[in-house]
Amino acid sequence: MAHGPRYRVPFRRRREGKTVYRKRLKLLLSGKPRLVVRRFNSNILAQLVEYDPKGDRVIFTIHSNVLKKYGWKGHRGNLPSAYLVGLIAGYEALKRGYKEAVLDIGRYKSTKGNALYAVLKGALDAGLNIPHSETILPSEDRIRGEHIANYAKMLKENEELYKKQFSRYLKEGLDPEQLPNHFEEVKQKIISQYQ
């Protein structure tokens, strides 16, 4: 660590690796609320946050655990569940009178088609206006969970590995090969609740 009279200690959140202030300033200068998306090992979190000089105000938070309420039996950290979280977040924002926002992915690397952008796609489909590039969004097949269903079909030849990989799906009574159909059912439940 540097020493001496000219050494300047960085802000605490910068030292802890939590905030990139240059990026935060650009988001705040837009004057729009931020759709903050955070990903954990088994869950997705989406928040609508407004700037306040005393500290950011969280308008609402949608955690992927809320998908249980709609009958979601799949994993809560994958692409289809991320899309559904984004869909709910988009409808909640519109319900509270917010028509536009900017996406805040924090310190995550921007990778084309990942779960963070699945949340963005869900919010866009709900009707929220968020500046984005179409090339960054995941494909419809991946959003529906086709890649998971195809992997399950391929893995079914090895029964032991299949049961180990998809144990939560099987415990919940969901055939992983039927995930795209299950996704559509849950999506329709969400849409019908908000319309």
Curated annotation (Swiss-Prot):
Protein name from the UniProt record: Large ribosomal subunit protein uL18
Function: This is one of the proteins that bind and probably mediate the attachment of the 5S RNA into the large ribosomal subunit, where it forms part of the central protuberance.
InterPro entries in alphabetical order: Rbsml_uL18_euk
GO BP, sorted A to Z: ribosomal large subunit assembly; translation
Gene: rpl18
Stated family: Belongs to the universal ribosomal protein uL18 family.
Superkingdom per UniProt: Archaea
Keyword terms: Ribonucleoprotein, Ribosomal protein, RNA-binding, rRNA-binding
NCBIfam families documented for this protein: PRK08569.1
UniProt KW Phosphoprotein keyword: no
Gene Ontology MF: a single term: structural constituent of ribosome
Alphabetized Pfam families for the sequence: Ribosomal_L5e
GO cellular component: cytosolic large ribosomal subunit
Quaternary structure note: Part of the 50S ribosomal subunit. Contacts the 5S and 23S rRNAs.
PANTHER family per record: LARGE RIBOSOMAL SUBUNIT PROTEIN UL18 (PTHR23410:SF12), RIBOSOMAL PROTEIN L5-RELATED (PTHR23410)
